[in-house]
Amino acid sequence: MANSPSAKKRAKQAEKRRSHNASLRSMVRTYIKNVVKAIDAKDLDKAKTAYTAAVPVIDRMADKGIIHKNKAARHKSRLNAHIKALGTAAA
């Protein structure tokens, strides 16, 4: 356990940041899950709306370092591919 005052402060800061980052990661997962649910329901309009809402959140979390930029790009690419496939299947 931390003994010096500075080590105690750093431990407190690390815990605070960890819980805040966990909350942000959870938020990103929720946005992604909303898009996936709309895709599974084959609701193109709802999927596009959810995707439009999710993209800026995913980008913002990648900029902050909450998720890796490649992971953000991978999520966006795969979700968009599913939505496009849903659009061609509906047409």
Swiss-Prot record:
Xref: SUPFAM superfamilies: Ribosomal protein S20
Gene3D superfamilies (UniProt xref): Ribosomal protein S20
Protein name (Swiss-Prot/TrEMBL): Small ribosomal subunit protein bS20
Presence of keyword rRNA-binding: yes
Stretches for region Disordered: 1-25
Record carries keyword rRNA-binding: yes
Annotated Basic residues bias: 7-20
GO terms classed as biological process: translation
GO function terms (MF aspect): small ribosomal subunit rRNA binding; structural constituent of ribosome
Biological role: Binds directly to 16S ribosomal RNA.
Family per similarity comment: Belongs to the bacterial ribosomal protein bS20 family.
Cellular component per GO, a single term: cytosol
UniProt keyword annotations, A-Z: Ribonucleoprotein, Ribosomal protein, RNA-binding, rRNA-binding
